Amino acid sequence: MKQILNPLKNSNKIPIWFMRQAGRYLPEYKKVRETTKNFLDFCYDVNKATEVTLQPIRRYGLDAAIIFSDILVLPNALGWEVDFKENIGPVLKQFKSQKDFQYLQRDSNNKLEKVYKIIKKVKEKLPSNTSLIGFAGSPWTVMSYMLEGKGKRDFRTSKKFIYENKILAKDLLNFITEKTSDYLINQVKSGVDLLKIFDSWSGVLAEDDFTEFVIEPTKKIILKVKEVFVKTPIITFPKGAGLLYEKFIEEVPIDILAVDQMVPLEKMKEWSNKVIIQGNLDPVILLTNKEIIKEKTYKILQAMKGKNFIFNLGHGILPETHPENVEFLTQYVRLYEQKNSNSTF
């Protein structure tokens, strides 16, 4: 069995992979990326997206590959205007009123077929003991990008919109939820072993709104996927949820909970009795030196020893990260597995 699908309590094997493990910090990624000007075209290029998905597996021997794509591929495939500007990031047409639904299609216009082809091609080339992760953005996070027109930190436009336009906001949320469910189901049909739902902006919502716009749509997606693929594990990542992580665990039928670096280790240990926990080394640690990486990693590994646990970061690998530090971290986790001791090394 592929280890990442079965990170069992008391197992000596600690599954390890990283968010944004394929990306700008890798020289081999940059070499491929330079060949395509437009980022979305790059995401839809079957050969190039396949290659960069496999690069960190070749380099580090990680337990899982995650399909190279972006959470905004889905709205783009549904007809929404999405662009990526250099040194700015994603720029989208703003959703402002009911009439904007005319720009959203019920059909993905065959663009998503390219994603499914990438999955199939990666699957053919991936080592048999390496799991393949598919993903999508959560409805709230995708919706907030559409409402803001770009990524922001306070999301006041999005929150103002959902307060003032409750029915329209729910219509948009439900549309994205339905399409996200279909998208993830088709990813499993194409060959992924498990799924991840990225909710990058869940932490900006108060409790009632968190329930309505994060918990409820996530539940709907999971239940719909599980109707078709009951055994496919699903990772959820309501980043920045803080105290609401516990409400999320209680109300969402999750298999694996990814947590950010702000979550205390004691909470991770406690929650691992209910779900598999994934996390949560601060990505900034990988910008430091080997001694600091070793110290911080050891603390997490000791706390989660014998627990239902997947080692990962609290967010994605940063672009300025040295690949050698990622290599060191991976080897250190492997060494910890071998030693499986309380002593430092």
Swiss-Prot record:
<keyword id="KW-0456">Lyase</keyword>
<dbReference type="GO" id="GO:0005829">
    <property type="term" value="C:cytosol"/>
</dbReference>
<dbReference type="GO" id="GO:0004853">
    <property type="term" value="F:uroporphyrinogen decarboxylase activity"/>
</dbReference>
<feature type="binding site">
    <location>
        <position position="315"/>
    </location>
    <ligand>
        <name>substrate</name>
    </ligand>
</feature>
<dbReference type="InterPro" id="IPR038071">
    <property type="entry name" value="UROD/MetE-like_sf"/>
</dbReference>
<feature type="site" description="Transition state stabilizer">
    <location>
        <position position="70"/>
    </location>
</feature>
<feature type="binding site">
    <location>
        <position position="39"/>
    </location>
    <ligand>
        <name>substrate</name>
    </ligand>
</feature>
<feature type="binding site">
    <location>
        <position position="200"/>
    </location>
    <ligand>
        <name>substrate</name>
    </ligand>
</feature>
<feature type="binding site">
    <location>
        <position position="145"/>
    </location>
    <ligand>
        <name>substrate</name>
    </ligand>
</feature>
<keyword id="KW-0210">Decarboxylase</keyword>
<comment type="pathway">
    <text>Porphyrin-containing compound metabolism; protoporphyrin-IX biosynthesis; coproporphyrinogen-III from 5-aminolevulinate: step 4/4.</text>
</comment>
<dbReference type="InterPro" id="IPR000257">
    <property type="entry name" value="Uroporphyrinogen_deCOase"/>
</dbReference>
<dbReference type="Pfam" id="PF01208">
    <property type="entry name" value="URO-D"/>
</dbReference>
<feature type="binding site">
    <location>
        <begin position="20"/>
        <end position="24"/>
    </location>
    <ligand>
        <name>substrate</name>
    </ligand>
</feature>
<feature type="binding site">
    <location>
        <position position="70"/>
    </location>
    <ligand>
        <name>substrate</name>
    </ligand>
</feature>
<comment type="similarity">
    <text>Belongs to the uroporphyrinogen decarboxylase family.</text>
</comment>
<keyword id="KW-0963">Cytoplasm</keyword>
<comment type="subunit">
    <text>Homodimer.</text>
</comment>
<protein>
    <recommendedName>
        <fullName>Uroporphyrinogen decarboxylase</fullName>
        <ecNumber>4.1.1.37</ecNumber>
    </recommendedName>
</protein>
<dbReference type="InterPro" id="IPR006361">
    <property type="entry name" value="Uroporphyrinogen_deCO2ase_HemE"/>
</dbReference>
<comment type="function">
    <text>Catalyzes the decarboxylation of four acetate groups of uroporphyrinogen-III to yield coproporphyrinogen-III.</text>
</comment>
<dbReference type="GO" id="GO:0006782">
    <property type="term" value="P:protoporphyrinogen IX biosynthetic process"/>
</dbReference>
<keyword id="KW-0627">Porphyrin biosynthesis</keyword>
